[in-house]
Amino acid sequence: MLVARDLLKAVLCAAVAAGMMLQVCTAARVEVYPQCFEPGGWSLDPQFMDVMGSPYLLAHGLGVRVMDATARVDVPESGEWRVWVRTRKWVDGAGAFRVSVGGRTLPTVFGRGAPEWNWESGGAVRLEKGEVEVRLTDLDGFDGRCAGVVLTQEATPPKGALSPEAQPVAETVRADFVVVGGGLPGTCAAVAAARRGIKVALVQDRPMLGGNASSEIRVWSGGETRYDLVRELRGRFTNSDANLALCDARRMRIVADETNIALRVNTRAFGVEKNADGTIASVKALDLKRNRVVRFEAHLFCDATGDGWVGYWAGADWRMGREAKSEYGESLAPEKADGDTLGASLMWTSVVANAPVEFSAPWAEPHAQGVEAVNGWWNWEYGIHRDMIAEGEAIRDRLLLATYGAFSLAKRRPENTNNALNLCPFLLGKRESRRLLGDWVYSEKDVTSRRPFADAIASGSWGIDLHFDNYRPGVDFLTTCHGTTDHGETYGRYWIPYRSIYSRNVANLFMAGRCFSCTHVGLGGPRVMNTLAQLGVAAGEAAAMCRELGETPRGIYAHDHIRMLQGRLGGEFPGVPDPKLADWRIVDDESAGVKFGNGWHKRHVHYGDQVGEYAHFPGKKAEPAVYPLPVEKAGRYALMGRVPYSWGAKPGSRTVCELTSGGRVETFTIDQAIADGTWRKLGEFDLAPGATLKLLPAKSKGYVVADGFAVVPAGI
């Protein structure tokens, strides 16, 4: 869409594409927004538009030149037109591209000028009245970027970005509940609310749902799932796995099937409108495909942006960085508060081709700081000491330079001749940035004491996992983790309160995801996606209750509706057993009478969903494990088993079991590959008091875990 800056003088010229995309121009100026190009091989990147003013096109070809981006424009009159291109030099030696207008290639090579976003002159070109083509041609495949093109008959360059804020609202969507952010927490919030019958608008700036768990970023979904909805929507593959695209498709199908959800993908929120009482009236967003502003109106809102943007625009209290040790009595906090956060990652991979593959980025090699690699894992992380929001683009670019440089160095070795760089996201996988404040600020002691909150709505078991850039002297993009995960004590299951998922000063705002109310250290455990997705489920259920009861988010707590909320969520909570398990008799690996032979190891499972706090894993020559089954009266029972979710469960993993009761011995297997943390029926058996279940690791295949079993009267 082409839009004149002076809307009072604008006249409608022509429809330029399907989807109601329009061209509007004046005699003196024509603006070509980046989102109006047919992108070819360029990627539209909106993740920094709140800082630099607009989305932009990125030639992210991993060293292979991308296909041209093109736009058709109507020139209102014949004459000489000056061409201005908004761009920046992101690094010396790469990121160059050319622009053609009306079939003429401009003499300027763009992307080699100033390091700041600016309007670079492409000179003047003679154009005839009518339709002409604007074309962007990538020169190297290394992240050249263009945030718009302006044709003008004036000698002065444009000012600022081609911002959506200059556009009028073209559409209004009305709902009961607006969720901004389509990662796992936001998607869970939307689906949970919709399934309770309220109208939901889900606003997501990418073409798919999942956020960090999507195939665009490829972070595995760690942490305790707890709720069936989280299990429906979570990722099912590990870091960097291309099969995460299957999970993208599953999420999109689940949301599309919910008739109460109006899903808007490729739509980036950029501001809010407020009521006189300070509550949010609407969220304004840019439809990136049709280049028009959409207003989303509702009574209730959920900030699931990760960066806390909705709360920030609405004036919600927030903080960013590390609190001082004295503020919350946190042993892992620094003596003095500072601006440090957890960093962001770009996990990247290469594959081995069947022929040599060229790759050379000598300009990036100094930025690798001596590191050579053909893959990058979670600890390729940067930004701990920088502003994760204001400097987001610089943080991402630093990680790109490290990746290209380390891979270029590795390619000099003969054994890597056939390696091809096949994945390096351009979207940052963030861990922490702005955190919105609620009535309870979740902190370290809530984890370590396992505080039994009466208003608990989520649980976690991932230890406090803090990252530091001290992996190797002189290398600033590799990190280590310290805290309570794999580095000291683990605390088992801990609880997160409802008071941490609504704003303390914006009365109609929930928050789900990493921007929930917590300290830096307090975020260290719950920050993994499955746990944060639980917050989304709770926010969605609470939003539906607000509409049903005429309450505000705070009112659900203040007016004693927490038990109702917990009942709708399901499961156990501190002091409240799970009513669905009233007739179950559970035996855990930590229960009295359970015996493990030699070779078994007790281990905390910080990815969650174990029955107790730990599970047992056998070595290669482990002896059997024996569970006495809690059978009080002879009869027909269903035997249930629960296997914690783990990346160790591969297809074909089978655990051989022997069930002994009343002199009979029955053998069966447990499919450990279906390790999703849910209770699964293993079969129905005639059982009598004294029955035992024996796990035989020596006869088993692949991954084996011993956790919890239950006997349930048949037919229940």
Give the residues covered by each predicted segment.
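Extracytoplasmic
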Residues: A28-P168, L581-I716
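Bacterial N-terminal signal peptides
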Residues: A10-Q23
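N-terminal secretory signal peptides that target proteins for export/translocation
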Residues: M1-L7
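Beta1/beta-strand and adjacent pyrophosphate-binding region of the FAD-binding site
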Residues: T172-G183
